[in-house]
């Protein structure tokens, strides 16, 4: 069949005959994605988000509650090994995102499509692979990726609800003992109030209104507000940390190998934003600048992670707690950190919700008439919000259950699938042995994250089953 392949000059396109696998021909004819215009023609859109808006969303997609647990993670790795490992993980995560974008752009050119999401890219990668079995089961690639994305992103939404309720509850319960003066290096909870589940329900109306925002350009306002509130809170934390940095000579450069898996499991999921990469690229006015924005955004995030993780461990040493906010004095300045994070996470919910909504809602809307499209759209959004709130309320130790599920889905999405996708995408064009080796090593690293995270979550679930019920904890979930 004949498709259009862009030449070096953007004004010239030459026809190229490709011998496509039979399964690829079927997928191309059945795929519901728009096919009018090539990727180069659609790279500039009259309506879309700007480069700055894309950067804001990208930074917000990465910067969640996980950064508060990184000082403890650095403790489990060592004051030298921890920051170095964070740097390596940031580079690998960024590289895998670039792989996904390149493969998606490759199939856009090859199949003359304006855009592709994560699931479509994997599906076409399998369809063009040299293996007949993979070609015949290419549709399962899209289904598996969509399932992982839905589970991961809605899982984050569930944990965000728990985080919102717990932090607001801590501030309210400590209000009688919170002072203006910041001397005591401790956050205490003295006055019991209503159950945290009632706090969760109190956020439901606000979250319901937020998810009704369906435009990424409008969501930029909320992402920008979230970034500002979180950055201000991190500045407050940082200025307290650097006031009194003790001698670091007593801290181990490299911690015990027995505790390093705890660092690995915490850190690897802090870089989880691959689910929003292609939706952001697809919505850009000029997608050609996306790789630069992606590198800039991940550089900002990695630098923040290393700074907070290393400085937090340097300041508090072995006394560092699971969330660095628990090491702050019980005064209004540092209690405001929790309130700022509540605002930030509240705004972040809508962005994390955007990905599963874009997968589920179009499938449902396609089954009804145009008259009912909007009511069905809004109803599904409201139902999904209620579902995340219900799961947050009903499931004991939700953080461990989601860590178990995330160990599989997050590792697969961020580290296992992208390098394997690169191999099957470029295999027929003579991919170098060095690239294959690099991709294999990254996939092995992702599989290690899956094994370590699964073991850690199962171990904690077993321990929690033999102890009194504990409140949900969110410091290890991004």
Curated annotation (Swiss-Prot):
Pfam families tied to this protein: Aa_trans
GO molecular function terms attached to this record: amino acid:proton symporter activity; glycine transmembrane transporter activity; L-alanine transmembrane transporter activity; L-proline transmembrane transporter activity; proline:proton symporter activity
Keywords: Cell membrane, Endoplasmic reticulum, Endosome, Membrane, Transmembrane, Transmembrane helix
Catalyzed reactions: glycine(in) + H(+)(in) = glycine(out) + H(+)(out); L-alanine(in) + H(+)(in) = L-alanine(out) + H(+)(out); D-alanine(in) + H(+)(in) = D-alanine(out) + H(+)(out); L-proline(out) + H(+)(out) = L-proline(in) + H(+)(in)
Residue ranges, Cytoplasmic side: 1-53, 98-143, 214-217, 281-292, 362-374, 421-441
Tissue: Expressed in spinal cord, brain, testis, lung, heart, colon, spleen, kidney and muscle. Found in neuronal cell bodies in the anterior horn, in spinal cord brain stem, cerebellum, hippocampus, hypothalamus, rhinencephalon, cerebral cortex, and olfactory bulb in the brain. Also expressed in bone and fat tissues.
Transmembrane segments: 54-74, 77-97, 144-164, 193-213, 218-238, 260-280, 293-313, 341-361, 375-395, 400-420, 442-462
Tree of life domain: Eukaryota
Disordered: region residues: 1-46
Membrane topology: Multi-pass membrane protein
Alphabetical list of InterPro entries matching this protein: AA_transpt_TM
Biased composition (Polar residues): 1-14, 26-37
One term under GO cellular component: plasma membrane
Subcellular location: Cell membrane; Endoplasmic reticulum membrane; Recycling endosome membrane
Swiss-Prot/TrEMBL GO biological process terms: glycine transport; L-alanine transport; proline transport; proton transmembrane transport
Residues in compartment: Extracellular: 75-76, 165-192, 239-259, 314-340, 396-399, 463-478
Function recorded in the entry: Electrogenic proton/amino acid symporter with a high selectivity for the small side chains amino acids glycine, alanine and proline, where both L- and D-enantiomers are transported. Extension of the backbone length, as in beta-alanine and 4-aminobutanoate or methylation of the amino group, as in sarcosine and N,N-dimethylglycine, are also tolerated but decrease transport efficiency. A free carboxyl group is preferred.
Protein name: Proton-coupled amino acid transporter 2
Native source species: Mus musculus (Mouse)
């Amino acid at each position: 069949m004949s498709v259009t392949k862009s030449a070096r000059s953007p004004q010239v396109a030459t026809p190229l005959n490709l011998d496509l696998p039979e399964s690829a021909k079927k997928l191309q004819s059945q795929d519901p994605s728009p096919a009018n215009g090539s990727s180069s023609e659609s790279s500039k859109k009259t309506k879309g988000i700007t480069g700055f808006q894309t950067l804001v969303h990208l930074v917000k997609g990465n910067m969640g509650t996980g950064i508060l647990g990184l000082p403890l993670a650095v403790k489990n790795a060592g004051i030298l090994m921890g920051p170095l490992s964070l740097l390596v993980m940031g580079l690998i995560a960024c590289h895998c995102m670039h792989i996904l974008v390149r493969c998606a752009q490759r199939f856009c050119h090859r199949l003359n499509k304006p855009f592709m999401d994560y699931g479509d890219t994997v599906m076409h990668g399998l369809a063009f692979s040299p293996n007949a079995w993979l070609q015949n089961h290419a549709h399962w690639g899209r289904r598996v990726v969509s399932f992982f994305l839905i589970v991961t992103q809605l899982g984050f939404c569930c944990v965000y609800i728990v985080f919102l309720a717990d932090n607001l509850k801590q501030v309210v319960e400590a209000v009688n003992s919170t002072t203006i003066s910041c001397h005591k290096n401790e956050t205490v909870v003295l006055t019991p109030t209503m159950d945290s589940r009632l706090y969760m329900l109190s956020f439901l109306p606000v979250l319901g209104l937020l998810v009704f925002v369906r435009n990424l350009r409008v969501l930029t306002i909320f992402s920008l507000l979230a970034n500002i509130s979180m950055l201000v809170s991190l500045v407050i934390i940082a200025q307290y940390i650097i006031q009194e940095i003790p001698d670091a000579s007593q801290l181990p450069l490299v911690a015990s190998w027995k505790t390093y898996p705890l660092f690995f499991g915490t850190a690897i999921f802090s870089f989880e934003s691959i689910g929003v990469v292609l939706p952001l690229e697809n919505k850009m006015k000029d997608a050609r600048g996306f790789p630069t924005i992606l590198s800039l955004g991940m550089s900002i995030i990695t630098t923040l992670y290393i700074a907070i993780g290393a400085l937090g461990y340097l300041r508090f040493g072995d006394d560092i707690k699971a969330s660095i906010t628990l090491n702050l004095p019980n005064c209004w300045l540092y209690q405001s950190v929790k309130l700022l994070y509540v605002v930030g996470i509240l705004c972040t919910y809508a962005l994390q919700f955007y990905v599963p909504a874009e997968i589920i809602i179009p499938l449902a809307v396609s089954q009804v008439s145009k008259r009912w499209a909007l009511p069905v759209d809004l109803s599904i959004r409201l139902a999904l919000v209620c579902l995340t709130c219900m799961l947050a309320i009903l499931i004991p130790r939700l953080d461990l259950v989601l860590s178990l599920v995330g160990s599989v889905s997050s590792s697969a999405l961020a580290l296992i699938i992208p390098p394997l996708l690169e191999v099957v995408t470029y295999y027929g064009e003579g991919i170098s042995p060095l690239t294959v080796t690099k991709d294999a090593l990254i996939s092995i690293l992702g599989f290690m994250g899956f094994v370590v995270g699964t073991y850690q979550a199962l171990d904690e679930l077993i321990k929690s089953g033999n102890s009194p019920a504990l409140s949900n904890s969110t410091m290890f979930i991004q």
